[in-house]
Amino acid sequence: MGYDVDIKRIGAMTLFDLKGTQKAILNWCGPHLPGFPDTPNTAATRDEAMFLHIGKDHWLLLADLSQEGALYAHLKPTEAPPDISVVCVSDTQCFFAITGADVDQILSIASPLDIHATIFPENGATYSEAFGLKALILRKPEGYWLAVEQSFGNMLEDYLSRATA
């Protein structure tokens, strides 16, 4: 049985890992963030940038690769105060977009994450696993994005291809 899905490997993305309290992050990064998500495991979006709350005092800033230089200049990772950590990790992740009518079925095959809208809302963003690999999973209006460590990109692409056959 085939599934009606499209799996696309997304090019590199700008990704910053931030650790610290919301107040400390706001004091340092302030206007350069899309805003803080309302609840853990969700994302706030503004101007194509996403700010993800993925754990206690743990955040990810995700944006188009063209924004990396400007964000680096604004966030100044090497000058961050000692109560926060700002690290550019853009080169560590491989992103995939999964879209189509059967996208929920494919994600259910790939991951144990409960994707019901009451549990994983439209702006859901969390770490879980995909085919046993640690994966960042984002709900998007058209489906999902999955990100795995760069070295596992080909493996995840193969697993997704096999799951949709």
Task: State where each predicted segment sits.
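Basic, glycine/lysine-rich polyanion-binding surfaces/domains
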Residues: 1-165
